[in-house]
Structures are given as C-alpha cells and as structure tokens.
C-alpha cells in the first residue's frame, strides 16, 4: 500500500472513530379487501357511519420520508371531514432509526406523534433500544400511551401497559388489542430486559411452541368481548416473513378466535390485505404498510358491518390556502374567525407568522400571512398539513447544525450492497462499509480483531464529505463497544 493510500485509509478510520466517540390519498389497491364482520356467533352493533382506522408501522424516524408525518396529519384531517369516527394507530418501531431519534433518545418522535394525534400505539422491538428507564419515560409522554397484552412484568405476571383500549363510535364499541413481538429479546438486546445481575425482569409470553403468546392474546380478546366490544382489531408488531414463525401474525390469527382484523408490523412488508383462517375457520384480514411512511393504512368498518383495508400511497391536496392578504381594518382575531372559525385561534395565526408580525395589535395592510392548519404543497410536490410541517421543521432546526459537521472524506461509495446486484448484502457477505466499521471498532478498542454486527449498519455513505449525520445514519443504535479477552 502506498503512503497516500495509507493516509486515505487512516482518514476514513478516524472518521468512524470520531463517530463512535460522539455516540458512546391515491390507494395502492383501490379495492383492498373486504370481509364480513358477521358470522362469529356474536350479536354486534353496526356503526351508524363508517369507522376509519388509519395505521402506520415501522416508521423508524422517517418523519419526512415518502408521505411523511405532515402528510399523515393532512390525510387524517381529510378523513374527519368524511366521518367523525377516525382513529390513528401505530404498530411499533416509530421512534428509532435516524439521527432525530438518536440525538433525542426518541423524544422528538414522541413529540411529533403527539402533534399528529395518535390514538393508540404498540411498542416495537426498537422502542426498547433506548433502554428500559428511558422507554418507560417516553411511554409516559406519549399522549395516547402504549398498549400490549404480552409485554409483562415477571415480578407480577401482569402486563406493563393496559392490554387493550376500547373506543366508542356512537353505539358501536371497538377494542384495539396491542401485541409485541417476543423477538424483542434478540432483535433489541436481552440486557435491556434484565437487572444488573442478569436476572430477567420482563417477558413477552415467549416459549418454544407459541402457545404462551396465543393463550395471552386469547385471554385479552375474550376480556374485551366480555367488556362489550363489537369488534376486535389486533395491532401487532409481529411480522410475517423472515421472522420466528410461531410468533408471526399468520400463526397468531390461526391459533386464536375473536379477532376481526390484524394490523401488522415488524417485517417491513407491503400487505394491502391478505386473508388467513382463524381457529374457527373464519377469514381474518391482515395488513401492513411497509416502512418509513411509504403508505398510510386505511381500514374501514362500514355501515353494513364489513371490514375493508387499503393502502394510500399519496395524499391528495385539497384546496391549498397558504397565504392571506391583510385587508384594511383586519385584526388577528377577525382573520382567525373568518379563516379558522374562531376568534380564539388568533394565537395560532400569530405563532405561524412571528417572523412577519412584530406587534400582534398592528397589522400592515397588504402583508401576506400564512393560515395555519391549511394545506401546503411542499418542495417535493407533496400535500402536507402546514402546521405539522412547520412544527417538524422547527424540531429539525434545533439539531441540523450539529449534523452538518464534516468528519472526513471518501473517494468511494461506502456501501452495504452487493455492487453486482444492488441487493443488501452486509449480513451475508463482505462489503467495504462493513470492513471499515469493523476496523474502526478494532482501532478504537485496541483489539486484535474487530467484529461489526451487519444488522446494526443501517445506511450507506456516498462519495465525498462524511458528516456526523452520515455516521449516525450508519450507526443509529445506541450500542456499546465491548472487548473480549480470550486465551490462545
């Protein structure tokens, strides 16, 4: 190796060493699927208006990716114009996966979920990546709370969170049952669920057959029915393909009865709607949206009692009204009444236009104001909710300067992919980014051999400057480096 190449190689290593130290609606399916909610042997109240359940899974901090949270907020608002019965749920892995999560230990994502207005959420395995004390703190800050029937305290044998939540839509009662994957032990880290002596404090109703999980879910479904639920919607971070089969959503449905539909997550699959027979032979709908807000899930319990599911890949823009020209005699309260329906909303107008308004009592005729809560067509041409978009941009502004710091430079793309096929290879074969991360661990820890977990390398680095943001994208997890000493 020439001296110049050695210097370049060492520069790349130092870049990752520095990072280590710093871290210590267009429907996709127009019809979807529709099933009868009758035939389970139960008399149930049919809704007087459609019940719309919007759902997300595996967002992984993708706040602006694809539809984005601001697009989701807009779509939720659009659905509320069609029916008063709208509920928004998340099936897990929302708060981890990008720098915004890493730098705030998940806090910014909880703030954004509260802004969008979630009504129900289930912990995914990556919700635990910030360790249990922080996760429980975040759970207390999430307005809707987390729900899970099988995440249990081993000391009491009881669920840590409420196992289900009942919603009333007129005379119709719908129970949402939360289910965590028992894979959380291995897909997160066993140490997160133990005390300092290595004793397990928490469990997920895991066993070698799946029966413990099925039994707990069935108990919860039966309890919700006894409490008056007309419909049971399971929200599970379970997955379908590539995960432990006995804990898959398919197996859970097949081993239980009483669930009317299952909203899934964990395996990042795009499943508009598939049908699986339950223990009684009844067809049950399973659906999943993919990842990073590629789609919004829309499930509808219709006025004839049937259940329909579809995926929305694009949010339509409806009557965007971004600017308002101040007229003679206008005041913030008068504009708020005219444009937003209430004099009291003048404070929202003021907050949205602070850069323009120096005195809320004095408005200059002809000045252009933004009406909050209106539709905005953003730079990518996507329709988003203005107020939510502004809120997210305010959060991003708080940490963007830190992320722009340049740590190094690369003449080559550093990749997790097989260059011949373009497929992700880092868990199965050698890649230059995998080699670099292993060398970085070896050097910073003073070891003879460096090992890097391929599953923990989550992004590529393009040719050119390497920023702190790049390294956090590669290493989004709060992992700790370890040294093992062994005799020869």
Predicted regions and their residues:
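Non-catalytic terminal accessory segments
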Residues: 3-7, 11, 22, 31-51, ...
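Bacterial N-terminal signal peptides
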Residues: 13-25
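Acidic, metal/ion-coordinating pockets
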Residues: 32-320, 426-429, 433-440, 450, ...
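Short beta-strand-to-coil "C-cap" segments at the C-terminal boundary of structured domains/repeats
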Residues: 303, 370-374
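Primarily a LysM-type cell-wall glycan-binding module
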Residues: 319-343, 367
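Short alpha-helix capping/helix-loop boundary micro-motifs
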Residues: 354-358
């Amino acid at each position: 190796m020439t001296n110049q190449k050695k210097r370049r190689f060492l520069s790349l290593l130092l870049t990752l060493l520095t990072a280590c130290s710093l871290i210590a609606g267009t429907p996709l399916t127009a019809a979807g699927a529709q099933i009868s909610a009758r035939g389970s042997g139960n008399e149930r109240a049919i809704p007087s208006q459609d019940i719309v359940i919007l759902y997300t899974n595996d967002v992984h901090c993708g706040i602006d990716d694809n539809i984005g949270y601001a697009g989701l907020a807009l779509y939720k608002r659009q659905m509320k114009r069609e029916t008063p019965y709208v509920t928004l749920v998340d099936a897990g892995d929302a708060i981890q996966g990008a720098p915004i999560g890493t730098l705030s230990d998940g806090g910014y994502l909880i703030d954004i979920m509260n802004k969008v207005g979630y009504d129900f959420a289930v912990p995914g395995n990556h919700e635990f990546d910030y360790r249990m004390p922080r996760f429980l703190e975040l759970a207390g800050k999430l307005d809707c709370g987390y729900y899970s029937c099988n995440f249990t305290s081993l000391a009491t044998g009881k669920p840590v969170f409420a196992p289900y939540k009942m919603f009333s839509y007129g005379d119709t009662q719908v129970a949402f049952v939360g289910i965590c994957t028992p894979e959380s032990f291995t897909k997160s880290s066993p140490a997160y669920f133990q005390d300092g002596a290595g004793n397990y404090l928490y469990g997920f109703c895991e066993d070698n057959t799946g029966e413990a999980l099925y039994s707990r879910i069935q108990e919860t479904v039966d309890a919700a029915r006894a409490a008056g639920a007309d419909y049971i919607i399971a929200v599970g971070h379970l997955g379908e393909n590539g995960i432990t089969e006995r804990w898959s959503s398919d197996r859970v449905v097949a081993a239980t009865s009483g669930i009317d539909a299952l909203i899934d997550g964990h395996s990042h699959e795009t499943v508009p709607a598939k049908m699986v027979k339950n223990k009684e032979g009844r067809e049950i709908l399973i659906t999943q949206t993919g990842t990073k807000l590629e789609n919004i899930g829309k499930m509808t319990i219709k006025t004839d009692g049937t259940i329909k599911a579809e995926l929305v890949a694009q949010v339509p823009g409806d009557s965007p009204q971004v600017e308002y020209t101040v007229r003679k005699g206008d005041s913030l309260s008068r504009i708020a009444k005219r444009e937003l329906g209430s004099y009291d909303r003048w404070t929202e107008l003021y907050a949205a236009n602070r850069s323009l308004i120096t005195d809320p009592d004095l408005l200059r005729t002809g000045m252009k104001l933004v009406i909050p809560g209106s539709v905005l067509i953003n730079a990518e041409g996507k329709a988003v909710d203005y107020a939510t978009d502004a809120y997210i941009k305010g959060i991003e502004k708080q940490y963007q300067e830190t992320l722009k710091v340049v740590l190094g430079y690369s003449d080559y793309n550093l990749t997790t992919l097989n260059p011949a096929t373009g497929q992700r290879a880092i868990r199965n074969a050698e890649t230059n980014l995998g080699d670099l991360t292993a060398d970085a661990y070896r050097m910073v820890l003073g070891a003879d051999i460096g090992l890097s977990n391929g599953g923990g390398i989550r992004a590529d680095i393009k040719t050119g400057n390497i920023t702190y943001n790049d390294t956090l994208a590669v290493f989004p997890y709060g992992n700790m480096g370890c040294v093992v000493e062994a005799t020869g």
